[in-house]
Amino acid sequence: MQEKTGSPVLRNARRIVVKVGSSLVTNEGRGLDADAIGLWCEQLAALVKDGREVIMVSSGAIAEGMKRLGWTARPKAIHELQAAAAVGQMGLAQVYESKLRENGIGSAQVLLTHADLADRERYLNARSTLLALLQLGVVPVINENDTVVNDEIKFGDNDTLGALVANLVEADALVILTDQKGLYTADPRKDPAARFVHEAKAGDAALEAMAGGAGSSIGKGGMITKILAAKRAAGSGASTVIAWGREPQALIRLTQGEAIGTLLVAQTQKIQARKQWMADHLQMRGSVAVDAGAVSKVRDEGKSLLPIGMTRVDGDFSRGDVIAIRDAEGAEIARGLANYSSSEARLICRKASSEFERLLGYTGEPEMVHRTNLVLTR
């Protein structure tokens, strides 16, 4: 970890995903702050006019919906939150459309769910649409489609959504703007010896230990969600900046190469696009546990997973679904596309491929997950 960053990452970035937190676009959670959004839109427009492609992932729909509905306390019932989101999305889209249009730039509203990104065809359709919008010089304003999702299929927070969008469009950089100046070695509110982290490698295990709990009562994500988002975005080669959103002209200064906030640098080697799609699954239909020999073959030697190395099959999945591969302790080591359904996998678990025809009634692939359809996660 470095004390100072002079990295050209943002200066050279042509495609940027910007995530702005609730506290930066609302009046302390009481509706949208149109003036603040206007300042963001001025910067977004300047970046587009400079030849960059920009996507905005913005919170604020529920806060705006609560204001329009006259609610003073955030509801706990999921259907009430969904109702607030539906009402608030109208206002959120209107403000961004108005403020960007004032700066001569078009906007588009895009609402995503995890199901959109988990399904390969819908994933590719979403990617094609976003890339088309960027080529047209339009700024897509993205939020989770809270109206139709529940806790089991939510992204969970917009930090995660920002990282997934960065991977979806293969962005050069992810900028997470928050109400904190960046990452410290400890909570500076509790530890006067806490040092500011200017630069580190995304995915550095020490970062997660540094991150505290939730920072703001308005949004959902604390620093830990931002650290994990940076780790996820790094898979497609996107470096991440976590910066204080109240910093004047933060986006402009970052893209001019100024050191603001914490820079989390991505690994140099990108994950193949299709494997990145598999890695980005937040929920999976099932998993298989494997023995130590299979762990070594898959993780250390880059081999396919054979059914003879499986010890247990969990969940209910179909052929072609993304499943997790876990070691004896239950830790995920990889994930990939299943060549067999869960019911078939249970029949061939611990069996050699020579027995498949007798057990299944047909001769299929010898692998449970072929190495070309497998991505390591640990």
Curated annotation (Swiss-Prot):
PROSITE patterns membership: GLUTAMATE_5_KINASE (PS00902), PUA (PS50890)
GO annotation (BP), single: L-proline biosynthetic process
Positions that bind ATP: K19, T178, D179
EC number: 2.7.2.11
Residues that, per the record, bind substrate: S59, D146, N158
Catalytic activity, reaction form: L-glutamate + ATP = L-glutamyl 5-phosphate + ADP
Pathway connected to this protein: Amino-acid biosynthesis; L-proline biosynthesis; L-glutamate 5-semialdehyde from L-glutamate: step 1/2
Pfam families found in the cross-reference section: AA_kinase (PF00696), PUA (PF01472)
Segments forming domain PUA: 285-363
Keywords: Amino-acid biosynthesis, ATP-binding, Cytoplasm, Kinase, Nucleotide-binding, Proline biosynthesis, Transferase
Subcellular location, principal: cytoplasm
GO CC, one annotated term: cytosol
Annotated compartments: Cytoplasm
Molecular function in Gene Ontology: ATP binding; glutamate 5-kinase activity; RNA binding
Family according to the record: Belongs to the glutamate 5-kinase family.
Function: Catalyzes the transfer of a phosphate group to glutamate to form L-glutamate 5-phosphate.
Identification of the protein by name: Glutamate 5-kinase
Source organism (scientific name): Polaromonas sp. (strain JS666 / ATCC BAA-500)
Encoding gene (name): proB
